[in-house]
Amino acid sequence: MITSIFWIIPLASVLALAFAWFFFRQMMKESEGTELMKKIASFVREGAMSYLKQQYKVVASVFVVLVILFSIMAYGFHVQNEWVPIAFLTGGFFSGLAGFLGMKTATYASARTANAARTSLNKGLQVAFRSGAVMGLVVVGLGLLDISFWYILLNAFIPDEALDPTHKLTIITTTMLTFGMGASTQALFARVGGGIYTKAADVGADLVGKVEAGIPEDDPRNPATIADNVGDNVGDVAGMGADLYESYCGSILATAALGAAAFVSSGSVELQYKAVVAPMLIAAVGIILSIIGIFAVRTNENATIKQLLKALAIGTNLSSVLIAISTFGILYVLGMENWFWIGCSVIVGLLVGIVIGQATEYYTSQSYKPTRLVSESGLTGPATVIISGLGLGMLSTAIPVLAVVVGIICSFLFASGFDFTNVGMGLYGIGIAAVGMLSTLGITLATDAYGPIADNAGGNAEMCNLGKEVRKRTDALDSLGNTTAATGKGFAIGSAALTGLALLASYVEEIKIGLLRLGENVLNFTDGRSIEISKASFSDFMVYYDVTLMNPKVLAGMFLGSMMAFMFCGLTMNAVGRAAGHMVEEVRRQFKEIKGILTGEAQPDYARCVEISTKGAQHEMVLPSVLAIIAPILTGLIFGVTGVVGLLIGGLSTGFVLAVFMANAGGAWDNAKKFIEEGNHGGKGSEAHKATVVGDTVGDPFKDTSGPSLNILIKLMSMVAIVMAGLTVAWSL
């Protein structure tokens, strides 16, 4: 079923891609500056593209194996929909394409931002922010284009006459969910690989350059400087983009599947269709309003950090207010039942995103007390810096967790008509809250991608000796970027929590389809009741599979899910440690063997450091990524559906809290160091500074590798469970 209002969705995605192209061409018209600026930028660009090429080779080999597996399951054993292998490939392809285009833009934008900062602060902000907007608009444009393409395709190819009319939309939405696994798999490799790369280079550059040799950050004498700048792009542009692409698509697809399920029992295809299309329309209008917000961002010369933050906030807040108002109009025009309260669920999602962002800023910005206390602890040595940072990270989990808890309850109650027994509509409300949170992704991701562009611009200005005034401007842009990056991580974690919950609910729908595919038509309960599977509700399946805390299989799954979060963090932290060790050895070797590096008479071998980070990341990212894919499959085969539900609950709850803790502790350590570098507590080179450098070095893999990767672990385990639902139903012990 497709009505005229549906076509707004593909049109909005094309509009996003058109504006992304416009901003890219606008950026490319700017001058890159001096020959040295161009040369430094080309080093970073070549390193970034070299890394991405290697990463995509590894990912391609994993995709080949998984596509063969899915094809056997679909065409050999018939426990999966035949569209799954193709859907999986398109999800991975578009996610990879979004990362590639975003990173390509970022590597061209850094020198142009530095050169624009020679003119004015506002000029530098405009170039960096609109280059970041390319990433934001490419992600939402490709994501919504992929979703609308699959809806149109499946609507055309899945026959009406062979199925109950309401069952057709259930098949379409659950099949579309599977391309989310392709996006999730690609995102995990991008996040883990990019995180290991960037932190191996960063830790190596800091330990030997700052601590041992006493040279400043981004100094061209440091052999790991280029690798460090490359890492900003592969981790914070390609990695963040793939992460949020996955959340964006996952939230829309899960909500569409929940909408189809909520109205199956009504027998009305029209009501079902409206619930399926609503999240897509909200996302489509969000794209248009994000573009308006992007044009609203501008600032004055000599602006302070708070004024720069306000400039970005004007854009994001304008988009958020407009989407809040528009949502009610969309749902009313669409003719949704209970349209006002479902609209309130969308507002809840927006508010949860804002609260998590503000809480993250409070705990990680040097403008506020928590980070300043961590900075002050540097006066008594590195041990107290580590202790205070860990304490801050643990305390910082309270507000995000409470925000998500309140958001879940409110969105459930609003959509269900304040009836806790109306589980189908309540879960739809949680899904639509996740869509609401991500509806302004076009501009919120622009502020995230802006960070590494500004960071690289500062590095370029430092290496090219552009003068104090230019460095002052790039430092201001860089400081703003650090805050937006920390806030962006909080936003990504919060969106992962709500999306993960929506995916968990969608898993039950996939179980329903798996049973029907096996020829099962009726659920026979122990009390003698029987219900048609096609008409069974979420609650019916919970009772049928005995998903209660008294079931040992559920408890076993919960413990395994909690363990997975910590194992995953342990593997990625150790991976950074090993890769950083190789980088430290290489930087020390160059300082020792290449005479004249420290005096500036000889050029370091930048390419060798880039190569070490690339190889380290490729080698180390495979084990944690494969573990995340295998865990739900094995749990399903051994403990069945109940065990998988427990695994997803344990992974979601533990992973969310652990991710907030790691991201905020790492962000606080980073900005505590920067606070001292501004001249506080003795300034650069003091004992307090050296202590906070140690804290920052420990915090690097916290905030840029393990913490952000947990977002994807939460969603990927749910996606794998959904795709493998047929296997679990057919062959579990």
Which residue ranges define each predicted feature?
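Hydrophobic packing and interface segments
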Residues: M1-L733
